[in-house]
From Swiss-Prot:
Record protein name field: Sulfate/thiosulfate import ATP-binding protein CysA
Highest taxon, organism lineage: Bacteria
Enzyme Commission number, as recorded: 7.3.2.3
Principal EC category: translocase
Role this protein plays: Part of the ABC transporter complex CysAWTP involved in sulfate/thiosulfate import. Responsible for energy coupling to the transport system.
InterPro entries xref list: AAA+_ATPase, ABC_SmlMolc_Importer, ABC_transporter-like_ATP-bd, ABC_transporter-like_CS, Mo/tungstate-bd_C_term_dom, P-loop_NTPase, Sulph_transpt1
Length: 365
């Protein structure tokens, strides 16, 4: 079941929380709405579900406009962060609930309900807990019950609001893998909300990064990591080093040092330079690729690599976080050398194109 979100706007009083949002979600795709608090991601999810109504715009399921349909008529499964299980019902009865309250003409008979719930219990690996009550379950088990209950009515679309937010780190990891496997098996269309970058990129087919009621980028997880569309995405998606300097001619000036860019940008003046920790070139010896001296402040072994916090020597005030591969891990106090050739340059929120990007733009003009 595909979802088309067309020009959705939403205001609460004078506060605009969604600004002309448009997004197409193909049938069978799992999409993460990712962003900080106040980005509008949960409001958008609730509008898809019919739990909130947009100020303007349309929601279509497989081409059918459902914008004015009540939530109960949209055939959407919704899983809340805090489970919303019925405390007085067993696990079995919680999962069966949605089936037992269907209109009489749609309601399965008791034997069919039992068979379906039994199958779902096996699917979520909780058959041995069918007679327990929510108070007797762990957080991860409760979330599986909530998911099984949502799937019981065979929803066209499954929506999840911060589904793992209330769980500890290890349980979250296990449930993420389990949900991804379940999605591969059942091929349902799903949208989930999260503020956790790792969760979004691990589980989703596509990540939609939101900020202040706008979509900043909607792409495959790897694309969002490697090719951020905006400065916000670059800074939000994981750790990043920022250096403030100036472009003069074909060089980036930082402190008393200059770094050749290999081309002369059209823009000249103050810039912010961004590098992910693994994008910083680092060496024990100075070279044309790694000419800038740093001193190791912290060294944290991470298995096949070492994460370092290094202090630039004479060319910048703020420490940098970098990654160094190999068995010969540096020690605190060691001198190393770094290079900046994989950097992204911004003037405010505007990206300064590299030479290859400038050539591509010129050829397409």
């Amino acid at each position: 079941m595909s979802i088309e979100i067309a020009n959705i706007k939403k205001s609460f009083g004078r506060t605009q929380v969604l600004n002309d949002i448009s997004l197409d979600i193909p049938s069978g795709q799992m999409v993460a709405l990712l962003g900080p608090s106040g980005s509008g991601k949960t409001t958008l999810l609730r509008i898809i579900a019919g739990l909130e109504h947009q100020t303007s715009g349309h929601i279509r399921f497989h081409g059918t406009d459902v914008s004015r349909l009540h939530a109960r008529d949209r055939k959407v499964g919704f899983v809340f962060q805090h489970y919303a299980l019925f405390r007085h019902m067993t696990v079995f009865d919680n999962i069966a609930f949605g089936l037992t309250v269907l209109p009489r003409r749609e309601r399965p008979n008791a034997a069919a309900i039992k068979a379906k719930v039994t199958k779902l219990l096996e699917m979520v690996q909780l058959a041995h807990l069918a007679d327990r009550y929510p108070a007797q379950l762990s957080g991860g088990q409760k979330q599986r019950v909530a998911l099984a209950r949502a799937l019981a009515v065979e929803p066209q679309i499954l929506l999840l609001d911060e589904p793992f937010g209330a769980l500890d780190a290890q349980v979250r990891k296990e449930l993420r893998r389990w949900l991804r496997q379940l999605h591969e098996e059942l091929k349902f269309t799903s949208v989930f909300v999260t503020h956790d970058q790792e969760e979004a990129t691990e589980v989703a087919d596509r990540v939609v990064v939101m900020s202040q009621g706008n979509i900043e980028q909607a792409d495959a997880p790897d694309q969002v990591w490697r090719e951020p569309a905006t400065r916000f995405v670059l800074e939000f998606m994981g750790e990043v080093n920022r250096l403030q300097g100036t472009i003069r001619g074909g060089q980036f000036h930082v402190g008393a040092h200059r770094w050749p860019l290999g081309y002369t940008p059209a823009y000249q003046g103050p810039v912010d330079l961004f590098l992910r920790p693994w994008e910083v070139d680092i060496s024990r010896r100075t070279s044309l690729d790694s000419p800038l001296p740093v001193q190791v402040l912290e060294a944290s072994p991470k298995g096949h690599y070492t994460q370092l916090v290094v202090q630039p020597l004479g060319w910048y005030n703020e420490p940098l976080t970098v990654v160094m591969h190999g068995d010969d891990a540096p020690q605190r106090g060691d001198r190393l050398y770094v290079g900046l050739q994989h950097a992204r340059l911004y003037n405010g929120d505007e990206r300064i194109e590299t030479r290859d990007e400038e050539l591509a733009l010129a050829q397409s003009a």
